[in-house]
Swiss-Prot record:
GO cellular component labels: chloroplast; ribonucleoprotein complex; ribosome
A GO MF label: structural constituent of ribosome
Protein name stated in the entry: Small ribosomal subunit protein uS15c
Subunit structure: Part of the 30S ribosomal subunit.
Keyword Transmembrane in record: no
Protein family: Belongs to the universal ribosomal protein uS15 family.
Length: 86
């Protein structure tokens, strides 16, 4: 399942590590970890800023994928169980 790939990038084949899907999975994992951190440390403003930067980057990648290939976009959104920007 793709949810586990964000934790272990070594499971992704070498030729697919730069793909949009793998980047979104990686960023989703980072977002989850930062969200857990911010639940404990709510006033950590530098982490909040980093979280917003990562969320923006993931959003841009999802918009790119939506424009290029909607089937891959819908598949990725379904596998990660998240709402897309569109």
């Amino acid at each position: 399942m793709i949810k586990n790939l964000s934790v272990r990038p070594s499971l992704i084949p070498r030729e697919q590590r730069g793909s949009v899907e793998s980047q979104v999975c990686y960023l989703t994992g980072r977002i989850k970890r930062l969200t857990e951190h911010l639940d404990l440390h709510g006033r950590d403003y530098s982490s909040q800023r980093g979280l917003w930067k990562i969320v923006g980057k993931r959003k841009r990648l999802l918009i790119y994928l939506f424009k290029k290939d909607r089937l891959r976009y819908k598949s990725l959104i379904g596998q990660l169980d998240m709402r897309g920007p569109r």
